[in-house]
């Protein structure tokens, strides 16, 4: 093995090249690699955070949907109760109106009945007076009297 000046020159040049690369080339490459690793790690962390945020938002939306459904069911239930109340009030009002109309009808019937009775009394009184006049016009004959009374009874 011959060591000559060329081999020593090449070794010195290689050592200088390695030193130059370690001093000036390697640090920017390492910085670029580390920056890229950091960006990738940050991106993965952001993705994980986004997934968690999405899950949280979905859970929140599900809760809000359940709450909205519960509120809607409550409103529907209240509306049904109000409807039933209105129907009951209308029935009660209709029953009261019906009772009022029936009472009014009964009162009208009673008034008409009383009027008819009064008319009948007047007619009976008139007939009785007419019968008495006829009896008085004739002689006080018991046979004629009986005949007139029978006619009056037949007319009444």
UniProtKB/Swiss-Prot annotation:
CDD domains in the record: ATP-synt_Fo_b (cd06503)
Which Pfam families does the record associate with it? ATP-synt_B
Its localization reads: Cell inner membrane
Q: Which domain of life is it from?
A: Bacteria
Any one GO MF term held by the record is: proton-transporting ATPase activity, rotational mechanism
> What HAMAP family does the entry give?
ATP_synth_b_bprime (MF_01398)
Q: What does this protein do?
A: F(1)F(0) ATP synthase produces ATP from ADP in the presence of a proton or sodium gradient. F-type ATPases consist of two structural domains, F(1) containing the extramembraneous catalytic core and F(0) containing the membrane proton channel, linked together by a central stalk and a peripheral stalk. During catalysis, ATP synthesis in the catalytic domain of F(1) is coupled via a rotary mechanism of the central stalk subunits to proton translocation.
**What name is this protein filed under?**
ATP synthase subunit b
Q: Which organism is the protein's source?
A: Shewanella sp. (strain ANA-3)
């Amino acid at each position: 093995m011959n060591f000559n000046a060329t081999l020593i020159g090449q070794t010195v040049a290689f050592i200088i090249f390695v030193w130059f690369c370690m001093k000036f080339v390697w640090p920017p490459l390492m910085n670029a690699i580390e920056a890229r690793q950091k960006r990738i790690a940050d991106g993965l962390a952001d993705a994980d955070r986004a997934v968690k945020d999405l899950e949280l938002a979905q859970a929140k939306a599900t809760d809000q949907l359940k709450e909205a459904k519960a509120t809607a069911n409550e409103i529907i239930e209240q509306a049904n109760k109000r409807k039933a109340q209105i129907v009951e009030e209308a029935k009660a009002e209709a029953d009261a109106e019906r009772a009022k109309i029936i009472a009014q009808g009964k009162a009208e019937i009673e008034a008409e009945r009383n009027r008819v009775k009064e008319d009948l009394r007047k007619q009976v009184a008139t007939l009785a007076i007419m019968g008495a006049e006829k009896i008085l016009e004739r002689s006080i004959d018991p046979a004629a009297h009986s005949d007139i009374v029978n006619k009056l009874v037949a007319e009444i």
